[in-house]
Swiss-Prot record:
Pfam families named in the record: ADH_N, ADH_zinc_N_2
UniProt-annotated location(s): Lipid droplet; Mitochondrion
Keyword entries, A-Z: Lipid droplet, Mitochondrion
Family designation: Belongs to the YIM1 family.
Family matches, as PANTHER family: ALCOHOL DEHYDROGENASE RELATED, RETICULON-4-INTERACTING PROTEIN 1, MITOCHONDRIAL
One GO cellular component, as annotated: lipid droplet
InterPro entries recorded: ADH-like_N (IPR013154), GroES-like_sf (IPR011032), NAD(P)-bd_dom_sf (IPR036291), YIM1/Zinc_Alcohol_DH_Fams (IPR050700)
Gene3D superfamilies to which the protein is assigned, alphabetical: Medium-chain alcohol dehydrogenases, catalytic domain, NAD(P)-binding Rossmann-like Domain
Name of the protein described by the UniProt record: Protein YIM1
Superkingdom assignment: Eukaryota
């Protein structure tokens, strides 16, 4: 057990004119939590694009001048539990989850996280990830790496369309992202979707073949639209897709969407989690997410297809699905790199680089 008075270090920022930094505060573990809360000693937290997107969009006049803490994914150990907390959450339990916030003083890139397990869902008990003897990462790293990305992918497949079959076909734009990694595993192993086509760079094709994609199309060898069209005609019997899922930001298919996406009446969807253009994470503005074209796609009653902006706050049951898939070995969270807490700047730079193949995780212990 830790000392009763501890120093809680967190990675924070104030607004989009201030850099991220480590801030420290004294925490009295005897009185820092309510009767319905637990204190989690955080072992690891994962970075996600939403972390520095919200940072760069944070105007102090709108969102205040208090410190805001990075990150949402976490893993750790419960070290304190209030008297009204459900007895399924006990001191010593290893847990992980997604702490949802936009500009919260509490975040997960911190040494101690205080939350209400009945409200701050999803939270779950950690499951062991099947590993071989050469695996360099422990269960805390893996446990922190998957909730938000897995949940976003699951929500996309679960929320918008309910009638997946072995005849269903999906096109994934951005096959190499962590969300798409989860998406293809869920699509093939949970929803039993028959055909998943991915778009990625030619250098990523061999890697992505192993993930479960049925076909892969390079975006850097000619026209994406023409290459997918050729695949559709030659291999897919010219069948259209039930869903086009965009995890990177793309608009190439909109002018010819009726050639690729099934009619609206057949419950087909175009779902994006990134907008119409690939984001420059070093220079983000509100226009990247609230463009006129996005608004028109969302509300235009005359468009011939269903367009949705996928959300990163998924249904609570995704966490149980993820646990089961991890235990069965049908999903293993992808890790790009792991950094110590004091290396948080390097971790952020790695994610901003757009070169990460998997999750960037920061360890506190």
């Amino acid at each position: 057990m830790p000392d009763e008075i501890v120093t809680n270090k967190s990675v924070t920022y104030v607004n989009n004119t201030t850099p991220v930094t480590i801030t420290s505060s004294e925490l009295d573990l005897r009185s820092c939590y309510q009767d319905d809360e637990v204190v989690i000693e955080v072992h690891a937290a994962a970075l996600n694009p939403i972390d520095f997107i919200t940072h760069q969009l944070c105007n102090s006049y709108i969102f205040g001048k208090y410190p805001k803490t990075y990150s949402r994914d976490y893993s750790g150990v419960i070290i304190k539990a209030g008297k009204d907390v459900d007895n399924r959450w006990k001191v010593g339990d290893k847990v992980n989850g997604m702490y949802s916030h936009i500009y919260g003083e509490r975040g997960t890139l911190t040494h101690y996280l205080i939350l209400n397990p009945a409200k701050d869902v999803p939270i779950t008990h950690m499951v062991e990830v099947p590993k071989d003897e050469n695996d360099p990462y422990d269960d805390f790293v893996y446990a922190a790496a998957w909730p938000l990305t897995f949940g976003t992918a699951f929500s996309t497949l679960y929320d918008f369309k309910k009638d997946w079959t072995s005849d269903s076909k999906v096109l994934v734009i951005g096959a190499s992202t962590s969300v798409s990694y989860a998406f293809v595993h869920i699509a093939k192993n949970y929803f039993n979707i028959g055909t998943v086509v991915g778009i990625c760079s030619k250098n990523s094709i061999e890697r992505n073949k192993k993930l479960g994609y049925d076909y892969l199309v390079p975006y850097d060898e000619g026209s994406i639209v023409e290459n997918v069209k050729k695949l559709k005609q030659s291999v897919l019997e010219n069948d259209k897709f039930d869903m086009i899922f965009d995890s990177v930001g793309n608009h190439d298919f909109f002018p010819v969407i009726d050639q690729f996406l099934k009619p609206k009446a057949k419950n087909s969807f175009y779902v994006t989690i990134a907008g119409n253009n690939k984001a420059d994470y070093k220079n983000i503005s509100w226009r990247d997410f609230v463009s006129l074209s996005s608004i028109l796609k969302a509300i235009n009653p005359f468009k011939k297809y269903n367009w949705r902006f996928g959300h990163p706050y998924p249904p609570n049951n995704f966490i149980e699905v993820g646990n089961e898939m991890i235990k069965k070995g049908t999903y293993k969270p992808p890790i790009d790199s792991v950094y110590e807490f004091d290396q948080y700047k390097e971790a952020i730079d790695r994610l901003i680089s757009n070169r990460a193949k998997g999750k960037v995780v920061v360890k506190m212990k």
